[in-house]
Amino acid sequence: MNIIDELEWRGAVNQQTDEEGLRKLVEEKKISLYCGVDPTGDSMHIGHLIPFMMMKRFQLAGHHPVILIGGATGTIGDPSGRQSERQLQTLEVVQHNVDALTAQMKKLFDFGGNSEVKMVNNYDWTHEINIIEFLRDYGKNFSINSMLAKDIVASRLDTGISFTEFTYQILQAMDFHHLYTKEDVQLQIGGSDQWGNITSGLDLIRKLEGHEAKVFGLTIPLLLKSDGTKFGKSAGGAVWLDPEKTTPFEFYQFWVNTDDRDVVKYLKYFTFLTKERIDELAVKVETEPHKREAQKVLAEEMTKFVHGEEALLQAVKITAALFSGDIKSLTADEIEQGFKEMPTFQSSKETKNIVEWLVDLGIEPSRRQAREDINNGAISMNGEKVTDVGTDVTVENSFDGRFIIIRKGKKNYSLVKLG
């Protein structure tokens, strides 16, 4: 299957500037292509992954991805998809974010071998251009009329857009031109909101290098969930690639909780599984939805891709322990991951009677209720039922001197931090 055919089968193509020309080009040779991300934060979220998964597919097909980190454009702010002006960040914050995103990209891509990936920062060539050069060499090639007609600008005319953000499309066009002349990049990939910026780059290259220049643009559809909401958010907000912001367990859970109506689409979009394997899983969704095999495979593939094999095994272990209620085998670090979103209480490390302890923490409303729940077998500590109201809670009951897990009833877990 041709790479373009595969992308279309996966539902990953929204618009192309010249489908026939691009298809012919990738059949004739291995091309260089690029996609950029601005360092507006110190971590990407799963929404950012979508174009870079496409870049990875090109890499696996033998093509040469160039990943651009927008050290320059990140100081300006992309107006695409926004109703208001971005807050400008200091150069120090931008550089911190550049370093963080660079580290994340290095985990996702193989920076060696026959299909080497390059990482570039547009600050390296942009910061040397003075204002006169910018206006004469680049600004002269842009019509205000066409810039105003771009959706990214037109959508902001009523609310207002600064000259800074207005010129963003020129800076991105300069990036494409630079990479075309220096790295032989012929294709830019981006989200559906980047169409205007991409076509600005194509126009600039043809004006400066001649209309015979073979350059192309391709955008990816906006990914929506079956309920019509935008993909990429959980109940707790964005799902980040940084394990400090979204733990591997939470990351795994996001995917494993995918709706049956969405899971096949996500398998096509995000995994590198074959068409045959995805078709098999699609049948399972229809015939055995209760087993949620497709969701488990999706969660495993994505967690392994982003966080690695060890983190995946840990996430699966935590999931199994929570499902069974047998949490004794978990480490303190695994407890911290698995119970991060549970009600959390603070306790000293001094020895205390279980009844007094539960009431003091606020897990139980009264001593009478605490005694009643214990006598009825409704209270478990670290996976074991508490049957004696005279039980003392000591630091020895904890995971590594850090945590105690209380379960009240079948599903009401609480995390108690000792300190």
From Swiss-Prot:
It comes from Bacillus anthracis. Catalyzes the attachment of tyrosine to tRNA(Tyr) in a two-step reaction: tyrosine is first activated by ATP to form Tyr-AMP and then transferred to the acceptor end of tRNA(Tyr). GO terms for cellular component: cytosol. GO terms for biological process: tyrosyl-tRNA aminoacylation. ATP binds at K233. Gene3D superfamilies: HUPs (3.40.50.620), RNA-binding S4 domain (3.10.290.10), Tyrosyl-Transfer RNA Synthetase (1.10.240.10). NCBIfam families: tyrS. Keywords: Aminoacyl-tRNA synthetase, ATP-binding, Cytoplasm, Ligase, Nucleotide-binding, Protein biosynthesis, RNA-binding. Belongs to the class-I aminoacyl-tRNA synthetase family. TyrS type 1 subfamily. Its EC number is 6.1.1.1. It catalyses: tRNA(Tyr) + L-tyrosine + ATP = L-tyrosyl-tRNA(Tyr) + AMP + diphosphate + H(+). It is found in: Cytoplasm. PANTHER family: TYROSINE--TRNA LIGASE, MITOCHONDRIAL (PTHR11766:SF0), TYROSYL-TRNA SYNTHETASE (PTHR11766). It comes from the Bacteria. SMART domains: S4. InterPro entries: aa-tRNA-synth_I_CS, aa-tRNA-synth_Ic, Rossmann-like_a/b/a_fold, S4_RNA-bd, S4_RNA-bd_sf, SYY-like_C, Tyr-tRNA-ligase, Tyr-tRNA-ligase_bac-type. HAMAP family: Tyr_tRNA_synth_type1. This is Tyrosine--tRNA ligase 2. Homodimer. Its main location: cytoplasm. GO terms for molecular function: ATP binding; RNA binding; tyrosine-tRNA ligase activity. A motif ('KMSKS' region) lies at residues 230-234. L-tyrosine binds at Y34, Y168, Q172. Residues 352-418 form the S4 RNA-binding domain.
